[in-house]
Swiss-Prot record:
Gene from which this protein is expressed: msrP
Primary subcellular site in the record, as a coarse category: periplasm
Family classification: Belongs to the MsrP family.
GO cellular component: periplasmic space
Any one GO MF annotation of this record: molybdopterin cofactor binding
This protein's name: Protein-methionine-sulfoxide reductase catalytic subunit MsrP
Top enzyme class: oxidoreductase
Keywords linked to the UniProt accession: Metal-binding, Molybdenum, Oxidoreductase, Periplasm, Signal
Amino acid sequence: MLIKKTLRAALAGDDIPRSEITPRAVFEHRRRILQAAGAAAAGGLVGAHGLALAAYASPDATARKLAAPANPKFVVPEKVTSFKDITTYNNFYEFGTDKSDPARRAGTLRPHPWRVSVEGEVRNPKVYDIDALLKLAPLEERVYRLRCVEGWSMVIPWIGFPLAELIKRVEPTANAKYVQFVTLADPSQMPGLSAPILDWPYSEGLRMDEAMNPLTLLTIGVYGQVLPNQNGAPVRVIVPWKYGFKSAKSIVKIRFVDRQPPTSWNTYAPNEYGFYSNVNPNVDHPRWSQATERRIGEDGFFTPKRKTLMFNGYGDWVASMYRGMDLKKYF
């Protein structure tokens, strides 16, 4: 059935309405906020929001800079997404459900001091201060594709080090089969927690071999500086061959467990968001196709969508981990 585009979707280059690509609870929450914002516009608040977003047009001159050489193994022969788009078009529901909410509202997050507890099935459990994490292993810049399950993508220059470096130091036991990542859930810092969208705190997980894969990056920076709050400060994980929601933000716990851990979106809608959630153009979301994507900042209404690559283009690095698996069943 042909779905008629809304004007907003057409201008954004979307092929389907936001109500079709957004979980119902999130869509209804956004609609209530937009209705309230209509009244605020008369008082000039919309202009203030615009000024807040304009502050992210270029890297923050006051933000802590990170010296990290580019790793030539991890580059993408595509245009890097602008700093403005990377920092103003985000999903981070702890700060709101609209794409601009994190940039406008994440100033309440306090990324320092910050501690990450590494626990569970490890011989050397430890609580890392964020400054200690910065020094745990040599930092490097990697340019990765980011593919959102909603059908859009970016190309981002992240800074961090392989998660495997941390894993080796804590020495997982033979019982450690999975790694769980838990995000901060502090209502005083995260106003979006008041919305009953997910069971907070946000959590994600990887199989142990996925966590140890050289691509999996413990990430503390972007565009030569520490992570902005809205991008998951002060530490997150990046798993570039999976849909973006697998890359947990603002991590406070890394837990090694003996069985597949519950994860937020898979718990919310297991028929829509699989535990693995590998980028796969051959396995559609129940409500939309995953065969193509829109590149943020480049692809508009009159630009044909680009084809989505299997494993987001990282098959040489990761395909062997899923050999013999039915990827339609284990999506």
